[in-house]
Amino acid sequence: MKNNYLNRLKSQWIWMLSAFMLFSGLSLAQTTTITGVVRSEGDMESIPGASVLVKGTTRGTTTNLDGEFSIQASPGDVLSISFIGYATQEVPILNQTSNIEVIMVSETSDLEEVVVVGYGSQLKKEITGSVQTVTGDDLADMPVSQITQKLQGRLAGVQINQTTGKPGQGMNVRIRGQLSVSAGSQPLYVVDGFPITGGINSINPDEIEDLTILKDAASTSLYGSRAANGVVLITTKKGKAGQTNVALNYYTGFQNVPHYNRLEMMDAVEFAQFKKESYEDAGQDVPVEFQNPSQYEGKTNDWYDALLQTAPISNYNLTITSNTDKMSTAVVAGFFDQKGVVLNTDYKRYSLRLNTDYKVSDKVRVGFNLAPSYVKDNTPRTDGDRGTGILFNALHTWPIMPIYDQNGELTYYNRLGAETGNIYAYPNYVRAAKEIINENTVTNVLTNGFVQYSPIEGLTLKSTINAEIRSEDYFWFNPSTASAGINQSIPTVAVSIRQGIRDFSWLNENLATYTRSFDDHNFDLLVGYTNQHFRREVTRVQADTYADDRLPTVQGGLNINRGGTNSGVGEWALTSLLSRINYNYKGKYIVSAAIRGDGSSRFGANNRWGVFPSISAGWVLSDEAFLMDAEKLSFAKVRASLGVTGNNNIGDYTQYALVNNTVNYVFNNNVVPGAAVSSLSNANLGWETTQQFDIGLD
């Protein structure tokens, strides 16, 4: 009896304690306004423009002209404050929520940091071009799918815009603005020395050790014909000195479209009243649908809200690194899963990376990297205005039109009488979001291997072979029961599209570097020869008129659409010679010169080769005797550069004549199929070049 009483008492205490913890947690989770000021160490001057971010979230702000900030956060959150030239400070939110003073400590030791540049590395202090580096630690704990999303607002002179709000969608990156009128404007992405062709959307951000942006011609000219829009160098994780390290990183959360700042839509009663008054004001008979607005009481259909959902997001990453005297290894495995805020929208990415480096002897090193990834997404056609995007069309659908019928089933379409002014048939866009398939899968494999030999002190010979294999499959199926457009009654003609893209790219690089110092003179020389080849095969089949929507295969369509069915092959090749020399005296007076020659199959026979030189110089003023005693000046360098870069994103066969095979001829008094040249060849087609002159003060 006593034991039963004790058990009941224990259960009551556990219940009360659980309830207390639950309500305590709820109260702690409430956000409040956090205010403070950011100052510099020593002079205690305020710092305007400092970045203030709630760690682990995308909530952030910047300090005003007086160094003050205001941000929404919860007790227990951590504020991460950063500014160029200062070490990042992390401030936990405890009891104090106002007038928080953050003191930024100057970060001068990074001048001796080694920074990755084109085809090598340099001391940050000795760089004469415009270069900015972001480390993986700076970008950690941000719940986004793409590395470029993490860079927004962090890089001077780099504009990053999201093309759509769909999960996993890529970003438009512009380095120092738009530099081309007709050719491509995206920067060149180089992953572990390999200029990739398939974009970086499939790369797991947690695989990245650091990222360097090359902005001016002095820093990009070694990439020649592809560097006019800037270069992004990505270095992935390697094994670090010490014992084996294992790290598991996981986060989860939810996303939704906030009600704040949404368009305020009429409810059904307000809409019917509005229509009734408009007819009365015009002196016209009021249609029966609007004569009694109160009949729609409690029957409002918010089409926009019906298309939205609370979307979970989760990310898992396992990182294993080890480093011994002989071998360095890093393994990163990741899984990212994000639902979209629109119904039937989702994005999944599976990724794996293996980086190994083995020291065969004091003179020989070999390495191998392998990075497969698999991405699958489904995204309803939400973009566009009237007739193309379901969100826009849903906003214009009358709230008196039902989403569900009396049996609780989704309606097919709505159309009122012409006297109501409703001249279009409105398909059920909720049904369209759920039933229309817009699926894309991408399998991508990046791999490279290298052999490095150092025959004498200061001389290094390195040969690499790189390959990228990419397979993309797209499937779109619009069943007869749904439509995303307007003025389309159901059933409609079912249509399917299947498209396959197969890419293969390889690159061979052979580089020699020689570094030498004597007295206070230091120089290094780089020479190299590279070859790259790319091939793409595309196959597309479009079918329609399906007897049964449950069989959306090509064979299930009664008609193969010839206009939407095609195939093609595209290839290009690039051969290059390159060289660079860096010289400095006492690390104070710095000169650098580089040149690259590119031969591309994309250009005319008379203009196939292009030459892209650059020269730059720097003077470290802070090392001069007349500035040694300047207490508030930790580092100062003036630099200037002049160079030429190119852009070869013009298509693979622009230099050739174009033949149109849809032209008809009259032969023997009969019209017969034929072909004709629709545009002439251009053997003098050449490079689009950009000349840049820069002066900077660091």
Cite the ranges covered by each PLM segment.
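Flexible hinge/switch segments at interdomain interfaces of large molecular machines
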Residues: 121-127, 293-297, 422-426, 483-485, ...
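Extracellular/periplasmic, surface-exposed regions of secreted and cell-surface proteins
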Residues: 139, 185-186, 314, 349, ...
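Hydrophobic residues in alpha-helical membrane-spanning segments
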Residues: 49, 400-403, 614
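A surface-exposed, glycine/aromatic-enriched loop/edge motif typical of exported proteins
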Residues: 256-285, 373-419, 476, 533-550, ...
